[in-house]
């Protein structure tokens, strides 16, 4: 069941200008623990995250990173706008698998699919990272780095995966977009969690387990967001699949010490969900 707090609200007017409600500034957030996890967490508390989310939303600087892949949606809905506004958009397959959707460009969150699995909200394109792409797809030029397609710098390693493998909290103190190979060695980050920008190498990385009979997804070569900078989890209130994925994402983040607010959109309005 879904619950709205009713206090944190944003609306988009007919001219696509994004505004804040006066209630947001005065909204208070409980400091009680949720699911055994306190709001005072690594990377800022829930109230701070909400405040930053509102500020970024107002300036049109929010990015959404999808965890599902709907080529038709991105080809028909987002690609033309991104192409016109950013000068990118030449490869819809790549965009659909590694999506940065700027709230200020879209004017709204468009989600026509009932099987949407969820979105993570961040304040910077580079923090969206990318989680999946198929190097075997003809549309993806071999040997080119993602930075040639997208704005911003990309994380050099999968921060959450590396932390789960090492339990080294120092991992969270580095900038994953600027860390050197030597620093990653010192942090003990395993090779399998380091970014692979060369598409041919990604295929090599997946070849051995495939030959052994394992079904390997391209996510074996994933690059993830920096969780301390993620501001929230988008929930499609009309999609049970989205709600289920949102709970899964929140629980996974809580286990690592990050408690993220659920954010839903209805009729051009954004609201925090107390629970899903």
From Swiss-Prot:
The alphabetical list of record keywords is: Glycosyltransferase, Secreted, Transferase, Virulence
Predominant cellular place of this UniProt entry's protein: secreted
Q: Which residues form a coiled coil?
A: none
Q: What happens when the gene is disrupted?
A: Deletion of the gene abolishes the modifications and effects on mono-ubiquitin and polyubiquitin chains. It reduces bacterial survival in mouse livers 5-fold at 3 days postinfection and dramatically reduces bacterial survival 100-fold at 6 days postinfection.
Q: Which molecular-function annotations from GO does this UniProt entry contain? A: glycosyltransferase activity
What's its EC?
2.4.2.-
Q: What does this protein do?
A: ADP-ribosyltransferase that specifically modifies host ubiquitin on 'Thr-66' residue, which causes the shutdown of polyubiquitin synthesis and disrupts the recognition and reversal of polyubiquitin in host cells during infection. Threonine ADP-ribosylation of ubiquitin prevents the transfer of ubiquitin from ubiquitin-activating enzyme E1 to ubiquitin-conjugating enzyme E2, which inhibits subsequent ubiquitin activation and leads to the shutdown of polyubiquitin synthesis in host cells.
Outline the subunit composition: Interacts directly with host ubiquitin.
Q: What is this protein called?
A: NAD(+)--protein-threonine ADP-ribosyltransferase
Native organism: Chromobacterium violaceum (strain ATCC 12472 / DSM 30191 / JCM 1249 / CCUG 213 / NBRC 12614 / NCIMB 9131 / NCTC 9757 / MK)
Lineage of the organism: Bacteria, Pseudomonadati, Pseudomonadota, Betaproteobacteria, Neisseriales
